[in-house]
Amino acid sequence: MRPAGYATAMNYSLRAKTGAEALEAVANSPFDKVELWWPWDTPHPSEQQMRQLVDALAKGRPENPRQLVALNLWAGDLAAGDRGVLHLVGPEEGADGAGAGTDPDAESGDPAITEELIEHLNVIEYLHRLTGVRRFNVLVGRGGRVLQRRQVRAFAAVAKRLARFEGIALIEPLSGIENYPVTSIKEAAPLVAAGGRLLIDAYHLAANGEDWTWLASRGAEYELWPEHIQIADFPGRGAPGTGDAPLEEWVNQLREAGYEGEVVLEHV
């Protein structure tokens, strides 16, 4: 089963109070495709915890498990306001967003990435082997409204390691978060240039007053073409139809222009 209409998958984390609650919702989902934020309070969950995710995907349908289409990387303590940790990785080298396009190699001692982050990415690769998930939302951290060079370098290092198993690092412009440097498509550009792909959340862009429908005129070869789309209505972040945003029209425009990815319901 798939969500009605133009959506293809459901995110079960936004409405959940805990990661365990999100996994329970996945286990009872009627849909074929699901998406999650990081469901554990540690970047290094145990084997048992990871197997609980696998079990949730397969519950009630062991021969045809639900597909995990995207997963947030660990982003710190979300309840405390964290939105990623890349602003804390490596030495500060200026706050001009420079460094896009560098090719850091963590294993050769590049300070762009820490051993803890490498261990987390090893967990991510293992989860990929368990579930097949390939798309990973990478939050860059609340280091200020200007993207720091070390954030770009760390993001590039993460994207490079994910690519070893055909993983894709997603960058998502957010709304309503103080001191977060990526709130528009333009601000995501240095991270796309560093090896990432754009994740569009229609609610966040509408909340920030950004019209993203111009992307349809650029076509699928455009460097900022979205890899992944999430939708919720605006205002309110409710289900489609609860607000004023022409979500179906926007999605159809991108489909007609060549978008072939997921359209994920992520609403309250």
List the predicted regions and their residue ranges:
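A structural motif
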Residues: 31, 130-133, 226, 259-260
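Acidic/histidine-rich catalytic cores of soluble enzymes
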Residues: 33-34, 161-252
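A cross-family glycoside hydrolase active-site/sugar-binding cleft signature
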Residues: 5-15, 35-37, 69-74, 136-139, ...
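Catalytic-core regions built around general acid/base machinery
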Residues: 49-63, 154-162, 214-218, 249-253
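Acidic-and-aromatic substrate-binding clefts and catalytic sites of carbohydrate-active enzymes
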Residues: 12-19, 36-52, 76-81, 143-148, ...
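N-terminal pre-domain/capping segments
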Residues: 1-125, 195-197, 224, 252
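P-loop/Walker A phosphate-binding loop and immediately adjacent motor/lid segment at beta-alpha junctions
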Residues: 67, 228, 244-263, 267
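Active-site acidic/histidine proton-transfer and metal-coordination neighborhood
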Residues: 64, 80-197
